[in-house]
Amino acid sequence: MLNSFSNAGIFLIQSIFDLYIFILLLRVVLQWVNTDSHNPLFILVARLTNPPLRPICRMIPSLHGIDFAAILLLLGLEMLKIAFLVWLQVNTTPHFIGLIVLAFSELLNQLINIFFYAVIALTILSWVSPLAHGPLVEILVRVSEPLIKPIRGILPSISGLDFSPLILLSLIHISEPTRPY
């Protein structure tokens, strides 16, 4: 039985892991969509993720714009987080295959969330300040546009209203994996 002190510790550990995994996954997404390397937000993400990635990048190079070192680190951190939390909560270690499946599921869910919230933020921003531009807007456009563009090709604007973000958000919501726990 876990007491409230243990629950607070578990929450803190999970939050720290989740925050760093999110930043690292954001780095992978920003590299994938070819974000400008001079963007201040990209520079911040790169500075936060470079220290553990440098030694791994020497062994595992990027290929076709995909940072395999970051993906390997993501998978390792997610597996470590899950194993550590399972060990703290039920005092056992999970099966390795189950750990890999859960880690992939969690990473896929977080990746989908990045796209989902980027589209929502860009949509709200287009209502509030349609002519806004800046480092954050550039990133939101770069992350959202590869997903919205094919839908715009199928469903053009109707009377000046663009329904493609709504369609995309519905598709993202439908495709979101269910958690096994």
Feature roles, as predicted:
Residues 5-12, 41-60, 100-107, 111, ...:
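Hydrophobic alpha-helical segments of integral membrane proteins
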Residues 5-28, 63-71, 109-116, 163-167:
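Hydrophobic alpha-helical transmembrane segments
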Residues 22-26, 35, 81, 117-121, ...:
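Alpha-helical transmembrane segments of polytopic integral membrane proteins
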Residues 25, 56, 76, 80-88, ...:
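Alpha-helical membrane-inserting segments
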Residues 26-49:
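Membrane-interface helix-loop junction between the first two transmembrane segments
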Residues 86-105:
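Membrane-interfacial helix-loop-helix connectors in multipass membrane proteins
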Residues 108-133, 138, 144-145, 165-168:
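Alpha-helical transmembrane segments of helical membrane proteins, especially in multi-pass transport
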Residues 173-181:
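Single conserved hydrophobic/aromatic residue that forms the stacking wall/gate
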